[in-house]
């Protein structure tokens, strides 16, 4: 049962935006390194957050809770309204797996960056690895 009226829920949800801080961090880094990309390109399965056509690479910047990052403390199932949350989160995970499989089958390099990997203590290492993975994929193709 929802604790809010329909109007309150609508107002709350209308303030949620698709652009997240982790996504902005990744995009700014890629641009600073000379990569040019497309955002949320609908032509590709799952509408990846970032698409680098030249490198045939699709990047998903996933929130640990929403996409249920395995073994992450941020991916805890809420204690209330579990009848709603469990199926919703399971559906998100299944959709992610399906979209990644489709992209890989089409020959794309798929990189998933988790929100927790962009915290300050891991950010530099994560972004350097991202750059290396993108460049390595170009060499393979």
Model-based region annotation:
Residues 1-112, 116-141:
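Nucleic-acid endo/exonuclease domains
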